[in-house]
Each structure stands twice: as C-alpha cells, then as structure tokens.
Amino acid sequence: MGINSDVSRPRARSTPNMSKKFQTIGLIGKPHHQGTNQTIEKLHLWLTAQGYTVLVEERVSAELEIEFQAVDLVEIGERCDLAIVVGGDGNMLGAARVLARYDVAVIGVNRGNLGFLTDLPPDGFETQLAQVLGGEFETEHRFLLEAEVHRHGMIKASNTAVNEAVLHPGKIAHMIQFEVYIDEQFMYSQRADGMIVSTPTGSTAYSLSAGGAILTPNLQALILVPMFPHTLSCRPIVVDACSTIKLVVSPDNGENLEVSCDGHVHLSVLPGDEIIIRRSQQRLMLIHPKGHNYFHVLRNKLGWGSKLF
C-alpha cells in the first residue's frame, strides 16, 4: 500500500550530500500500464536501497504494491533534483511541460514505442543509471514553445509545448483559412487542414509525419509545416527560434478551431482570433548517459542504413 505524503512536509530539496550529485529523485510513469508499474517498483527498490529519497507521482501510485511517498507533479518539480519518467515520449512530454518550470534534471526509461526522449532500457537500467547518478552524464537543454490565443486584443488562453503547437479544425477535419506572419511580416495566406509549428525536439514527431525536416536538437530554430495545403508550391519553412509567429484565423471560417500543444492541451480558437507562438523562457533539462549520440538514436529508431565499411 502507498503512503501519501504529509501535507505539512516543507516543499524543499534535501540538505546537500556532496558525495551524491542527486539527492531526491521523483518517479513518474504511464498510468494503468503494467510494464510501467513493474519498472517503477524496481526503480523505487533499487534507489531506496542506495539511500536516495524517492517520491512517486500520484497518478501511478494507486497501482503500486510498495511503500512510497505519493506527491503531485508540481511537488516533484519543487523537491527533486532528478525526475525519472517511465513510459513513452508522450509521457515525457506531459511531464516536461510542468518540470521545465523547475531546476530539475529529467531522464527517461522507455516503455513506449520509438522513444526518442527516453534513453534507458526498462530491463537492465541499473548499469547506465548508476553511472548517471555517479555524475557520468551529458546535459542537454531543450527549449519550449509558448502558444497564446488572442481575441479582441486580449489573451484568452495560453499553454506551453515541448514538441509542437498545431492549429487545426475542431472535431471534424476540413480545410481552414488563415494568414501567417513572421515577426509581423506577412509571409502568406493558407488554405489547408492546419499548421504545425515545431521545435527541434518535435521535428521527429508530428512534424516529421507531415513532411517536415528533422532538426538536430542543438539548432535554435523552428519549423512551420502546413498540413495538406491546397497548393502544389507550399513547403515547410525553417525560421529562427527567436521569431514570433502569428497565425490570423480568417473570420470566414465557419466553425471553431483549436490549438493543440503536444496533442495534450487544447486551446479553443474562434474565427478572427490570432495565435501567437514564440519561444518560451522555460527550458527542459534532459540528461543522457555518457556517449549519447543523436544520430545513433535516429539510425536506430528510424531504421536508417548502417555503416558500409
């Protein structure tokens, strides 16, 4: 049975122990997934045996058969030095949008499909994780997007995205009309099923499926990918990450639209609204085992050809 966290417990990180790079570790997982539960239990037992303080995210806590401290995702961000996300890239994205607000390192254990963001294997994670906990890791910062819906000069809704912000029809797929501005300069009008604005992190996700290029994570750039544009000449375009992108929805659109952030959060959009998408001040601090190679990940996940000689 789980032990809920004491509500009177101060939300502060542990007193530093100079012999350990990380002191308090949060475990986050894919809810209602047997494999994830097994991995979290193994991680919890392994980490506590080595003297770490371990917190478990409350959404997965009800299904575990060990004693633990159950807390919400915000408290993990406030109290932990390291968060381990067990699941697929979707679970990593959901956690990352919250954890990016805090100075907490994040690493993933892959219990999903491709797993571009989750480095550690669910079986035999101990060797690599021990090296990471011992200070042998590489740090990588990924920037986020901030998406805002403006209506009559006021911000009506906003959220952040690690992968992409997508303007699209609501419940029924159909063509929509909108104008695209980059740093207040008109680029073009579009008649399409929508527009994907992606970070380099998201360039191997929805953007890639829609025909966008892969951007290496260190690039300070965004890629705009029209979705099924009603023209033969429109192609994805890469712009500087410091650009402000404005999508102006035509008042002639007959139905309400949406902006999706990483496919998790949906912002309602009305005809005539303006969507402002820019680089967020928040950054996700990913850590990888030593020797992490992005092109090895691409080659492995996408089935690219191996060396010829």
From Swiss-Prot:
UniProt EC number: 2.7.1.23
Superkingdom assignment: Bacteria
Similarity section: Belongs to the NAD kinase family.
Alphabetical UniProt keywords: ATP-binding, Cytoplasm, Kinase, NAD, NADP, Nucleotide-binding, Transferase
Protein name listed in UniProt: NAD kinase
UniProt catalytic activity: NAD(+) + ATP = ADP + NADP(+) + H(+)
Cofactor(s) this protein cannot do without: a divalent metal cation
Example of a GO MF term: ATP binding
Location, primary (coarse class): cytoplasm
NCBIfam families, per database record: PRK01231.1, PRK03378.1
GO biological process entries: NAD metabolic process; NADP biosynthetic process
Subcellular location: Cytoplasm
EC top class, as a word: transferase
A GO cellular component entry from the record: cytoplasm
InterPro entries xrefs: ATP-NAD_kinase_N, ATP-NAD_kinase_PpnK-typ_C, NAD/diacylglycerol_kinase_sf, NADK
UniProt-annotated binding residues for NAD(+): D89, G90, N163, E164, H174, R191, D193, T204, A205, Y206, S207, L208, S209
Catalytic residues (positions): D89
Function: Involved in the regulation of the intracellular balance of NAD and NADP, and is a key enzyme in the biosynthesis of NADP. Catalyzes specifically the phosphorylation on 2'-hydroxyl of the adenosine moiety of NAD to yield NADP.
